[in-house]
Amino acid sequence: MSSPGNSGVAIDSTVLKAIELGTRLFKSGEYLQAKRIFTNALRVCDSYSQEQIMRIRNAYQLDTARPDNKRLYHPRYIKILDNICACYEKLNDLKSCLDVSQRLLKLEPGNIKCYIRCTRTLIKLKDWKRAYKTCSRGLQLCNNDSNHLRQQKQFIKNNMVQKQDGKRSYIDPLEETKIAKKKKNNNVLESLPKKKIKGSTKKTDLVGNLPIEILPIIFQRFTTKELVTLSLVCNKWRDKILYHLDCFQEFNLAPINFKNFVKFMDFLQQNFTRTYRKYILSQVKVSSRITSEELRITQLLFSKMPKCINIERLILSMPTLTTTQIFKLMVRGGTDFFTRLLELSLMITYRPDKQHELEILQTCPLLKKIELIFVNSLVPIFDGNNSVGRDGSFNVMARHTNMQISTADNDEQGIVEEKVIYSELEKITLICDKKKIKNFPLCRALLRGQFPLLQKLTITGVTFPMNNQDIMNFQWLLNFPDLKELWIEDNDNCELSKFLQLLKFSNVWKNLEKLTFRENKLYPIVNLDEDQPVTNDDEVPSMLFYKENLQNLEKLDLMGTSISGSALTRLCEQEYLDGRKLRSLNIGNCPNIQFPNNHAHTARMILDVNAVLKRLSKLEEINLSHLSSLNDSTMKSFIINVPFLENLKRLDISHNFEITGISIYEFLKKFQMDHDNEAGGQPLAYLNIDGCSQVSHITVNMIRAQNLVTQVDCVYERDVWRKFGINSYSYS
């Protein structure tokens, strides 16, 4: 269409701008505002006189003839009405939309688009007869050449057939004539639409109709909770799901009251005992919602568990039950429940005057992993003080431990006779709340080497007895040469210096891969130079076993210990640590590790960053959190040695309050430039700067924008690094 001439532009500009603005609002989803603009534009068009409209139509080179003095309309009048109709449709005002669309049909009966919109509106109003008439008239006008109208007509016919229900339906004479001619010429009976609809709307019940052999493959992808929810859909689904009981692998009943736990046990009894086969549950987790019901729930679990069910992993959280109560319930419930138990986790109360934790292990002959979390301690009444947490109770508990250890030392023959070997146990996790427990559970068994195949050992929150030097000096670790992971954290009377003495003079392990040693307070500074024996140079290498014990380490965590910077430097320089294998190093919160501000490495607390990073070039993770000497000045030593960090992926420098964003940005920029690949600089995978108050959020946003780090954790108000069960086993 040609553009309007100058004579009509001045008059028509208001309408054109209104149409442009309304269209823009419509596309942006502002349908109500767009409708108002189009309505105002329509009023402007109606306000024009016939002479003005004739000038505008002349400007658009349109016909201006007025046969029978009929009214002329603005060239955009139909367009504006159609836009108003579209706005009403989007606003779901179907009645107004129908009124406008019918007005359009009167003004321009040959516009197929108007028939499509009017039919669609009538369909939404479920006025099937009027919709059918309107659609048929539109198809007559266009000689059945509109796909939209044909689809609408078929849709209307289908819905009219569904709504018949024996009532008289609307018959179109034109359509009936066409159908009669087709039947006469082709002599073929067309299939009834009702049959087609029945076939097309037939629903498929996947769970109910699929072969029973395929259902386990589908059910295995659902959790137990999801399977229980699906079983409530209908009885057919319930029967299908309960037929495949092998799909129930885990039950998480935390927390639960006794009434619901009885229902759970009834569910197991009714469904799992129908056949004579065995079922294996990978995990059952139980904790009581009400403290007073812990004993009843545990008793019911141990005594009423069906014999056809074997549990591989049992997690039991009953803080008020003692080791003595648990053991007695296990004995009363029978041994069938525990004969095939592979993993056991107990959160209970410790009895320092008994050794029932060992009897619990004896009840589970195939146990491979044991996790004991002691949240409280219960002392006998005859000791005069059974309140946990006061000094008197701590002294009583300490006397019990000392008495047991001294008895074990003085009666070796009796120990040999009573010694029980737990030949299947591979992992022990012992976690105590040291505020309430002043003992070392399992110390007798550790001293006597009753776990010959132990590979993973975690000890947290215990108190090493002062009167037993074998425990204080870690001599009991000699009983576990196959240990692969050792985690010692937050224990009283537990010193790194004595631990290193053992590694120095004894070949303890064959293949230790992960070592975590964290002290709970600051002990005298650990310096390997002072610990060296005064001997001839030829004899020194044969007496030191640091390398034999530490050469296979993949992870070393000395966070919060008294180790000095020179000691860690010596471990690397003497190649006691194998830089080709070590992947993770954590020296956070070590106050005796200082970084050099100059090139003079004389103080024993100074860590030679160049020597350490040069020999530990395969490091993938470094933790430098809570280091008082880490600031912008000392950070330069890491920036200089970035070329040695070619494999670094994760860096934690959180809770360093003096470091600023400038040095962090320089380090990351240097790291990216020195680790180029084909696609450009390689960014660091993870950076943790939680609690670094001097780092601006602007710097953090810049680091993210320039893709210097894939993931950044930056929470300014976070004041705790430790997360129980994630990076720490310290219960407190």
Curated annotation (Swiss-Prot):
GO terms for cellular component: chromosome, telomeric region; nuclear replication fork; nucleus; SCF ubiquitin ligase complex. The keyword Cell cycle applies. It is found in: Nucleus. One of its GO terms (molecular function) is DNA replication origin binding. LRR repeats lie at residues 425-449, 480-505, 509-532, 550-574, 579-602, 616-637, 645-669. Pfam families: F-box. Keywords: Cell cycle, Leucine-rich repeat, Nucleus, Phosphoprotein, Repeat, TPR repeat, Ubl conjugation pathway. TPR repeats lie at residues 15-48, 78-111, 113-145. SMART domains: FBOX, LRR_CC. Gene3D superfamilies: Ribonuclease Inhibitor, Tetratricopeptide repeat domain. Residues 204-251 form the F-box domain. The modification Phosphoserine is found at residue 393. Belongs to the DIA2 family. F-box protein component of a SCF (SKP1-CUL1-F-box protein) E3 ubiquitin-protein ligase complex which mediates the ubiquitination and subsequent proteasomal degradation of target proteins. Probably recognizes and binds to phosphorylated target proteins. The SCF(DIA2) complex is specifically involved in the pheromone induced degradation of phosphorylated TEC1. The SCF(DIA2) complex binds to DNA replication origins. Component of the SCF(DIA2) complex containing CDC53, SKP1, RBX1 and DIA2. Interacts with SKP1. This is Protein DIA2.
